[in-house]
């Protein structure tokens, strides 16, 4: 195996190519910066990224480089939000679990995959480490795989291995992995977390996201037993439950005894904890996010967030009005899978108000807002004022339930909107 310089490695990229880039906290920035250095030689290169976190903006997503590179996202990484606002980048609306199908079916042809992998083992296998998500299927379908080998990348079990013979060009890219601090839940988030935790039974299998509310839920599960983890993102928050044996994965049907995820977001401690740890399995999103796999786990619990919820139960989670700030991600995949699970439950958790004092329970979604979870899938909605169950409720009764967990300062306005929309049907409920 011969190591090339980064600029030599990306020399295999041609004009018109489509590149799939590994994400999570292991974006191969060495390769992307080298690619950008070739901008004068390249035209119409599409760069597709999934969820990712990096403090530096994507180097290829600049106005002056638009003839060379087109930035496309499945889920808008934090370092491409400015480019999205300015129209430099665009998004492909897609359920995350279906992205590998788009690659494998050829609907989105993949020419090149950029990876950030571990050192090869004695048999020549590199690990994708903390991010299989869309990278595994991207590399599987790519005509050319280019990788930066990173001494900081842990080795994980599951999908994430690739032999050096499958990699066309390799360079060194010893970048410390991005760390994501564990947020301390606020008082409001703690109240929301308690409402949700009270609905989670012993023996449940958890899909839980990232942020203050998910950590508040985790903190409230300290007296539970025999929980399982089948999720998209594994975070530091679950480690105390694993170390105490509260998450033991003993009742799961999919990978019993093991915690399953598709990517990892956390601290150096978490990355080191997972290194060569057979208690964790990392699979690509075609597996982790498949509702037919999720439903096999008993009491599957899908816990997700939202930007706003309207009075019929439509849930916006990817945009603020017309401005897309994230993506569908795995919310639909897990909400649907949990709904099909025996004893499963789906939760949407959000504060009742924004930091600017605007209600998140609204009469109608903002113009241009995307519906990530439809009113037909909505089950439990929780704010700091309570939790309500919407499934099978008629629209007027849904409105009444949602108003009850809105901030008290906006309830009268929401009631007037409900009367205007539902008429006597709403009035008869009072």
Put a short name on every predicted segment:
Residues 1-430:
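Conserved alpha/beta enzyme-core scaffold
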């Amino acid at each position: 195996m011969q190591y090339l310089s980064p600029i030599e490695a990306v020399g295999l990229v041609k004009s018109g190519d489509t590149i799939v880039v590994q994400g999570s906290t292991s974006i191969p920035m060495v390769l992307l910066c080298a690619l950008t250095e070739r901008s004068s030689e390249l035209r119409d290169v599409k760069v597709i990224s999934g969820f990712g976190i990096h403090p530096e903006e994507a180097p290829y997503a600049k106005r002056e480089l638009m003839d060379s590179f087109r930035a496309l996202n499945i889920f808008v990484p934090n370092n491409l939000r400015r480019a999205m606002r300015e129209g430099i980048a665009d998004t492909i609306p897609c359920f995350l679990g279906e992205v590998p199908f788009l690659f494998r079916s050829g609907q989105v042809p993949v020419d090149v995959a950029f990876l950030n992998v571990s050192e090869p083992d004695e048999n020549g296998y590199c690990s994708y480490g903390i991010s299989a998500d869309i990278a595994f299927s991207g590399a599987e379908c790519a005509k050319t795989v280019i990788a930066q080998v990173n001494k900081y990348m842990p080795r994980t079990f599951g999908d994430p291995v690739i032999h050096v013979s499958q990699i066309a060009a390799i360079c060194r890219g010893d970048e410390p992995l991005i760390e994501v601090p564990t947020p301390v839940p606020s008082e409001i988030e703690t109240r929301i977390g308690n409402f949700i935790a009270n609905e989670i039974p012993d023996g449940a299998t958890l899909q839980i996201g990232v942020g203050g509310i998910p950590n508040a839920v985790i903190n409230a599960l300290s007296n539970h037993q025999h929980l399982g983890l089948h999720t998209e993102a594994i975070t530091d928050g679950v480690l105390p439950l694993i170390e105490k044996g509260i998450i033991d994965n003993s009742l799961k049907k999919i990978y019993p005894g093991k915690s399953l995820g598709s990517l990892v977001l956390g601290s150096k401690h978490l990355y080191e904890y997972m290194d060569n740890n057979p208690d964790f399995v990392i699979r690509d999103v075609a597996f982790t996010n498949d509702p037919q796999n999720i439903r096999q786990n008993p009491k599957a619990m899908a816990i997700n967030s939202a930007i706003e919820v309207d009075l019929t139960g439509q849930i916006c989670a990817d945009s603020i009005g017309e401005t897309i700030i994230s993506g569908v991600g795995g919310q639909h995949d897990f909400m649907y899978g949990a709904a099909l699970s025996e004893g499963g439950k789906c939760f949407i958790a959000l504060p009742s108000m924004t930091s600017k004092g605007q209600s998140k329970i609204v009469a109608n979604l903002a113009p241009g807002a995307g519906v990530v979870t439809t009113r037909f899938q909505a089950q439990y909605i929780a704010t700091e004022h309570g939790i309500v169950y919407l499934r099978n409720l008629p629209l007027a009764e849904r409105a009444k339930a949602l108003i009850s967990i809105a901030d008290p300062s906006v309830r009268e306005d929401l009631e007037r909107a409900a009367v205007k929309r539902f008429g006597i049907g709403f009035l008869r409920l009072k």
